Regions:
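Terminal peptide-recognition signature
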Residues: 3, 36, 56, 88, ...
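Short amphipathic alpha-helix with an adjacent loop that forms part of the alpha/beta core around
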Residues: 72-83
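Periplasmic-binding protein-like
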Residues: 84-91
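Aromatic/hydrophobic pocket-lining residues that form π-stacking "cages" and hydrophobic walls in ligand
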Residues: 32, 77, 165
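Glycine-rich phosphate-binding loop and adjacent beta-alpha segment
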Residues: 95-174
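Mid-domain Rossmann-like dinucleotide-binding core that forms the NAD(H)/NADP(H) cofactor-binding site
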Residues: 1-71
């Protein structure tokens, strides 16, 4: 449900756009990527490890998947997104977001579903304050950055989700693992 509503309502994917998905092989990320492909996007997944990336490409149908543990992850992301990033589905935060930020296109959309990299944080990470850069980028590039709480924001649309997602699963367009 978060994948469906966050991507379709906030991300608003259009054919030919580049969608980057963090936590690409988790339940939400895997679904986001597959819906992105159904909508005609070029999908770049980000996952932790070669096996997860292989799964994203071979089973889920992503175009590319990058291992965020790689020393040159940021450089790989630049190469994987030669036309920039139109949608970044945020599940993680941290260094993945830092690598994505400079690649965002004008009018990019960022549905914020989670920030797993900072769930247990009790203080800000060391280093420079990145908020001014984030806000300047959001302003200059007119980026839509929107968090959402699925039950509160979209609970009333559960039947829409069940109908369309049920059809996609029935037609074998969306794959999932329990």
């Amino acid at each position: 449900f978060p994948a469906y509503m966050g991507l379709l309502d906030i991300g608003q994917p259009k054919e030919g756009e580049t969608l980057v998905v963090a936590a690409a092989t988790g339940p939400v990320g895997a679904t986001v990527g597959q819906i992105g492909k159904l909508k005609g996007c070029r999908v770049v997944g980000v996952a932790g490890g070669a096996e997860k990336c292989r799964h994203a490409i071979e089973v889920l149908g992503f175009d590319v998947c990058l291992d965020h543990h790689a020393d040159d992850f940021a450089e790989q992301l630049v190469k994987a997104c030669p036309k920039g990033i139109d949608i970044y589905y945020e599940n993680v935060g941290g260094k993945v977001f830092d690598a994505v930020l400079p690649l965002l296109n004008t009018s990019a959309r960022i549905p914020v579903c989670g920030l797993v990299s900072s769930y247990n944080a009790t203080e800000l990470p060391p280093g420079p304050d990145r908020l001014p850069l984030l806000m300047a980028t959001v302003l200059k590039k007119r980026i839509r950055l929107q968090g959402f709480i699925i039950a509160q924001d979209y609970g009333h649309r559960i039947h829409e989700f069940q109908k369309e997602m049920g059809q996609w699963v029935k037609e074998d367009k969306i794959h999932y693992h329990e």
